[in-house]
Amino acid sequence: MEQDKLIIRGARENNLKNISLEIPRNKMVVMTGLSGSGKTSLAFDTIYAEGQRRYVESLSAYARMFLGGVEKPDVEQIEGLSPAISIDQKTTSNNPRSTVGTVTEIYDYLRLLYARCGVPYCPTHNIPITGQDISEMVAQVMSLEDGTRLTVMAPIIRNKKGTFKDQFAKLQKDGYVRVRVDGEIKLLEDDIELEKNKRHNIDVVIDRIIKKEEAKGRIHDSLETALNLAAGMAIVLEGDQEELFSSNYACRICGFSVPKLEPRLFSFNAPLGACDTCKGLGFTEEVDVDLLIPDKELSIREGAIRFYKNIVDTENIEWQTFETLMKAYKISLDVPVKKLTKKQMEIILHGSDRPISYKITSSGGNTYMRNDYIEGIKDMIERRYVETSSAMSKDWYHSFMIESKCPTCGGKRLNEQALSVRVGDRNIIEFTEQSVVNAMDWLEKTELTETQAKIAEQVIKEIGSRLRFLKDVGLDYLTLDRLAGTLSGGEAQRIRLATQIGSRLSGVLYVLDEPSIGLHQRDNAKLIDTLKNMRDLGNSLIVVEHDEETMLNADWIVDIGPGAGIHGGEVIFNGTPEEILKSEDSITGKYLSGRLRIDVPEQRRKGTGKAAELIGVSEHNLKHINVKFPLGKLVLVTGVSGSGKSTLVNECFMKAVQQNLGYTRIHPGKYEKVKGLNNIDKLVQIDQNPIGRTPRSNPATYTGVFDDIRSVFANTPEARLRGYDKGRFSFNVKGGRCEACWGDGVKVISMNFLPDVYVPCEVCHGKRYNEETLQCTFKGKNIYDVLEMTVEEGLELFANQPKIRNKLQTLCDVGLGYLKLGQSSTTLSGGEAQRVKLASELQKRATGKTVYILDEPTTGLHTDDVKRLIAVLEAIVDTGNTVIVIEHNLDVIKCADWIIDLGPEGGDNGGMIIAEGTPEQVAENPNSWTGQYLKKTLKWTKAKKEKKQK
């Protein structure tokens, strides 16, 4: 009998406190708890990791060498474990070739559809291009009336310049007698004179035949000769009427040809189909004059050209060469660049149009004579960017460049041949430019021929089912050509979820990380139904989630806590949703039952009375909207998924402010004009990206408190006696660190086909510093001991050090008191990383004119963490600053001073302002999806508050 429970015994991974529990199989199980409580450690680092390890262990040593090893999690035993698949929030891919269509495999099926059912059309004449075999051509000719006089010709030259003397001589040598030149029959034995610079059409007369049944073989042979001579083309002339035949896919009028249709012709990753200019990327990188010359008021000698700024009037060879170019064309180095003529700018950017003789003196005093073209600065940077192998040089050259739409394909990635093929009224790229919902509609309505329908039946079924799965997980607004790297974590996760649904696996354990992220409440029910469908196929689901609706729809809930970090790691509750509502121990249960809640503020802030305004915003799907962001308030930008929130805030507003503050390389989205940006003197974006990419980065180094701690240690009696400065207490530089492990505390041992093994350094025993440094102590603790402390413990140790105490207090204020000061940044969750950034910003002096931008800050946060986050955001606003938040969480939305709600739907049907105002005003707007859900929340919160007061 199959085991109906997943049994975990003795789980001790990260902060888990030797926990044991049983959870049902083939059910939807939600794991919840405060941020940092250990739910991810249990779900991903223990259960999924063990499932993955068992799979890898079952493979041969040779296969394991390529897969890499999976370390055994710190758990005594797991029973009843199925093959495990993880669907997390990591962005799908930053590869510019990866799109929604390729990730979901829809594009693979589309390529097959267009290869088998597509019809090429001439891009110039808009007529279908068809290829015939010779028997079809003969049959068409034989359908003419008997006695019809025919001339078979081979079109060898089409619309080309030249005299073609050599071609005429060869044709005569091969036995041909007549040619038709520009519509006029001529004898090859005559001296045919053609204008060299005029375009000509030349056809070779192969045969003149009277159509009759006995001539069928002769017609076949003549057509075959013509096809061989003219690369698959033949003309049959009947009086004044002529018919162009082609064994290729070629236009009968202009000869535009298409290779044999096959799936790789429609791949922008294959040379056959990719645009030759951009190689299938859809964009090219070129030097932007505004980045090269940011201030055109300056002269070249004053450093107007950023590339030469630091080498003006030096012996640098690059400057000598450039100065020679300027002298050769008498271009002044001392007039403002804006006064230079268009021709002079052409010389500066693209170089000389003739060779120049000049001499170069090297730094060693040697003189070299040269006579050559001198390259322009723009052309030189673009050439070097491609040629250099140095990452540093590449970054330097790239700082002058921008991405621009490919001039050849117009951003469509494919070459003209691939784009000429249509199914119905669209080519393959036009299909991918549609949103998921529009693509579904088009597939249903497009009429195919009987043959096409039969061929395409299974392919269309596969495409349609994948589109439906995307719609079911709330992604119907996405276009199939959307770059995977531009997706949010939640969108990327739901795409992988849709792909898994499409595979229809059963008997699998799926581990998901907050699939509801980025999803509006309206779409949540569809996602929950999708998860239930996966369960009903015979799969087990473990969902790490904070969303109340998802929890209440689960079959089972595991609550990890009671607190975070060292205060968590225990199973607080393990049972059904009905039971958790009555639990006295579970903080989650108290919020779900309404015993705990986040209160609505008593009153909304008035703000400063000033606003930043964008007029005529039309980037992506935004419909030429005018938006006011009131300053000195907590502003929430809301709307269903894909309605344009991130485009408005991140692409348009934020970049407009950054540009106004003097940031370079910033290109805001489309808008007509902007007002009120002078009321903002600083902009801070606080996202959930890691605070550091290496294990050496940690909360103490990021917030700057470690500098202060090192200063304290440098002032201890022992350190002063030995002459140590604060650099001695850094694990990143020589001096105080252990040189055996370079301050890492561990050494990596490569095991070839086994996973790398990390062993504590045998010299410092994992303490990162050398013995002399560790002998310096503060209140009995050395520098290693401090890094191993939690923020709360550090607060106690440094209670009499105001500078350190204040910085550590801000970390506690944002709910991170449980973090170790030296905890590697790579181990922090997105929510934790964001709060470390918040704490770092809170330490800085408020200007009162700062704008903070946060994109879905509640990701990874329990309702209790959200309560703390709201308090922090309100503290920032109370100092006169502005906080703009993109969010779906109703607890945050109801605490806003001002809401901008976009919609009404996602994608093409979004991009309009549906409602603006206080939460109470938006809640009364019947057209706002957010308002409808907000109205229920405000009523529910008010009712609970009144009940408690009674």
Please tell me what each predicted stretch does:
Residues 1-950:
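Conserved phosphate-binding elements of NTP-dependent enzyme cores
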